[in-house]
């Protein structure tokens, strides 16, 4: 064979090898492209297909990361920043947990008879307020719902699976840790946080229908007993009285009226407003599980905000508590003494003129007294002042007993003790060094007028109670004659009707409080003493030792519905 033919055969052989190498490299490139396609698909949200098409060794790579992710997710679940079903929807995963949310098998284990949301929302084990959950099987409060949380451990140990977040009002199943979505649970959230529409609030005083609690007892919304924890009946009576003042009640039934009020950081006084609003909504809730309410959270706020001046375990004075509470509410709502007004001012605040005259010392000679009376210091002065309530002074009780060795209980008409404010009657007030004569005259009558009958006097040794009975009509008390002449023409409506009467029974330090309230829808009177609620005749109210009274000013278009 010639050298030329050898070169041709060698060239053809090398060409075949090059073509084969190019073909093999093309096949390798195509295979690499096919391997890259599932990786790109995995980034678009199909991780399952990637694991099946990849090599068996790749299937075992993410396995150790799964429990870590699950633990992290369950720990983050305690924060309740976003429902888990929304997170799954964003990630494109709609799994069986959504179906479990709509068909939880443990809803029949809920025991509504043990649910009580009147107490402070804190964990029964850690005493923490953060992420508090209520077990709907036993009614206890626990913290968290992640792994090793108290709620999680409780669900595993006792097989209690349904929990309610007391802050977000969402239901969860533990230990499976998925949210429960069911319309049959709406009555539980309504008991925890009742809400009222403007139409419902407007119709409260027109309804005379009894509501039925879950335990079968019937009650009138607003005429509900308050639990006496130990010695808080003085506060219960005042809170019951204020809850039956329609403008004040309507304001606090609608949380939007006060929830956006700006307060300084760390201000604890606004807690009083929040707790009072919650108590009002519970007292007027027509769908309560029980026919009574515990004021525990409200009283905890009172103890905190009053710096333990008023306590749950120690008897207090109703007038002192009423005075402090109204002023604290006014201040917490952003009110000031002169300029900024609140709902408390609009409802209860009136005004009067106070005339004051200084008296010479009684031990001075008569001639020196006459000379001092001509000085400017001893001339009568007048100041304008506002008031939240009027203090009515009782005549001194007799010291002697009758022929049957019983103390004489005197009686006095209401108009006799109201004469203090006619602008003519003078009363002497003594201080440590000086004596004054004062007289009072009303210049403005509020829509709701509070009378505080002064029954207790303190001396250096003990507190003495005046048992004098005040005779008063239930309706048609006209106060026009106690206004100054120039104000009488401006005040068209000066007639008042009684709506609440607080009574103190027993000794000053060992007595108890009860209250008579008028239900506007039925026009009937009811007596409330802690958890006891009974109806009472209007004629029986005047026989009691009245201590605090709330009177409603009658409008021109208003008719008398009390029938007394």
Curated annotation (Swiss-Prot):
InterPro entries: Papain-like_cys_pep_sf, Peptidase_C19_UCH, Ub_carboxyl-term_hydrolase, USP39, USP_dom, Znf_RING/FYVE/PHD, Znf_UBP. The keyword Transmembrane does not apply. It is found in: Nucleus. Disulfide bonds: none annotated. It holds the Pfam family zf-UBP. Disruption phenotype: USP39-deficient embryos display early embryonic lethality due to a failure in primitive streak formation and apico-basal polarity in epiblast cells. In addition, USP39-deficient mice are more sensitive to LPS stimulation and bacterial infection. Residues 28-39, 84-96 have a biased composition (Basic and acidic residues). Its EC number is 3.4.19.12. Zn(2+) binds at residues 135, 138, 154, 160. Keywords: Cell cycle, Cell division, Hydrolase, Isopeptide bond, Metal-binding, mRNA processing, mRNA splicing, Nucleus, Phosphoprotein, Spliceosome, Ubl conjugation, Ubl conjugation pathway, Zinc, Zinc-finger. Residues 59-69 have a biased composition (Low complexity). There is a cross-link at residue 51 (Glycyl lysine isopeptide (Lys-Gly) (interchain with G-Cter in SUMO2)). One of its GO terms (cellular component) is nucleus. One of its GO terms (molecular function) is cysteine-type deubiquitinase activity. It catalyses: Thiol-dependent hydrolysis of ester, thioester, amide, peptide and isopeptide bonds formed by the C-terminal Gly of ubiquitin (a 76-residue protein attached to proteins as an intracellular targeting signal). The modification Phosphoserine is found at residues 46, 81. Gene3D superfamilies: Cysteine proteinases, Zinc/RING finger domain, C3HC4 (zinc finger). The U4/U6-U5 tri-snRNP complex is a building block of the precatalytic spliceosome (spliceosome B complex). Component of the U4/U6-U5 tri-snRNP complex composed of the U4, U6 and U5 snRNAs and at least PRPF3, PRPF4, PRPF6, PRPF8, PRPF31, SNRNP200, TXNL4A, SNRNP40, SNRPB, SNRPD1, SNRPD2, SNRPD3, SNRPE, SNRPF, SNRPG, DDX23, CD2BP2, PPIH, SNU13, EFTUD2, SART1 and USP39, plus LSM2, LSM3, LSM4, LSM5, LSM6, LSM7 and LSM8. Belongs to the peptidase C19 family. This is Ubiquitin carboxyl-terminal hydrolase 39. The lineage of its organism: Eukaryota, Metazoa, Chordata, Craniata, Vertebrata.
């Amino acid at each position: 064979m010639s050298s030329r033919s050898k070169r041709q055969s060698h060239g053809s052989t090398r060409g075949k090898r090059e073509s084969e190498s190019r073909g093999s490299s093309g096949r390798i490139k195509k295979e690499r492209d096919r391997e890259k396609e599932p990786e790109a698909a995995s980034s678009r949200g199909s991780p399952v297909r990637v694991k099946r098409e990849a090599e068996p060794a790749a299937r075992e790579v993410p396995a150790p990361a799964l429990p870590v992710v699950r633990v992290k997710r369950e720990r983050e679940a305690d924060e309740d920043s976003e429902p888990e079903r929304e997170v799954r929807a964003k990630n494109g995963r709609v799994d069986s947990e959504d179906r479990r949310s709509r068909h939880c098998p443990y809803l029949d284990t809920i025991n509504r008879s043990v649910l009580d949301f009147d107490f402070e929302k804190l964990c029964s084990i850690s005493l923490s307020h953060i992420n508090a959950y209520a077990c709907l099987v036993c009614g206890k409060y626990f913290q968290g719902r992640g792994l090793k949380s108290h709620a999680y451990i409780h669900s595993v140990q006792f097989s209690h699976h349904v929990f309610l977040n007391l802050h977000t009002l969402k239901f969860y199943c533990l230990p499976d840790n998925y949210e429960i979505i069911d319309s049959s649970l709406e009555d539980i959230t309504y008991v925890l946080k009742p809400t009222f529409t403007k139409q419902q609030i407007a119709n409260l005083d027109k309804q005379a229908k009894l509501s039925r609690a879950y335990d079968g007892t019937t009650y009138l919304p607003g005429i509900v007993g308050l639990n006496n924890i130990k010695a808080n009946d003085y506060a219960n009576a005042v809170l019951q009285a204020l809850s039956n003042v329609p403008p004040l009640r309507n304001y606090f039934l609608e949380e939007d009226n006060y929830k956006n009020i700006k307060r300084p950081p760390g201000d604890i006084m606004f807690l009083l407003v929040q707790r009072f609003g919650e108590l009002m909504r519970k007292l007027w809730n027509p769908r309560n599980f029980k026919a009574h309410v515990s004021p525990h959270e409200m009283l905890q706020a009172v103890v905190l905000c009053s710096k333990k001046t008023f306590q749950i375990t120690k008897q207090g004075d109703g007038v002192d508590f009423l005075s402090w509470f109204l002023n604290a509410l006014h201040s917490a709502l952003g009110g000031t003494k002169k300029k900024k007004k609140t709902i408390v001012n609009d409802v209860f605040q009136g005004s009067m003129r106070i005339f004051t005259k200084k008296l010479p010392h009684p031990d001075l000679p008569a001639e020196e007294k006459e000379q001092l009376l001509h000085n400017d210091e001893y001339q009568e002065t007048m100041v304008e002042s506002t008031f939240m309530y009027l203090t009515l002074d009782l005549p001194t009780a007799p010291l002697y007993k009758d022929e049957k060795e019983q103390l004489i209980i005197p009686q006095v008409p209401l108009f006799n003790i109201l004469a203090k404010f006619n602008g003519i009657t003078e009363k002497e007030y003594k201080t440590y060094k000086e004596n004054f004569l004062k007289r009072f005259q009303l210049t403005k009558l509020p829509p709701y007028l509070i009378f505080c009958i002064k029954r207790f006097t303190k001396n250096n040794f003990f507190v003495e109670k005046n048992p004098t009975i005040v005779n008063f009509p239930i309706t048609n008390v006209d106060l026009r004659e106690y206004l100054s002449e120039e104000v009488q023409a401006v005040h068209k409506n000066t007639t008042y009707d009684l709506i609440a009467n607080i009574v103190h029974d027993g000794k000053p330090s060992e007595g108890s409080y009860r209250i008579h309230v008028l239900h506007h829808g039925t026009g009937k009177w009811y007596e409330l003493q802690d958890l006891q609620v009974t109806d009472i005749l209007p004629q029986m109210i005047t026989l009691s030792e009245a201590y605090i009274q709330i009177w409603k000013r009658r409008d021109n278009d208003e008719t008398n519905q009390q029938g007394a």
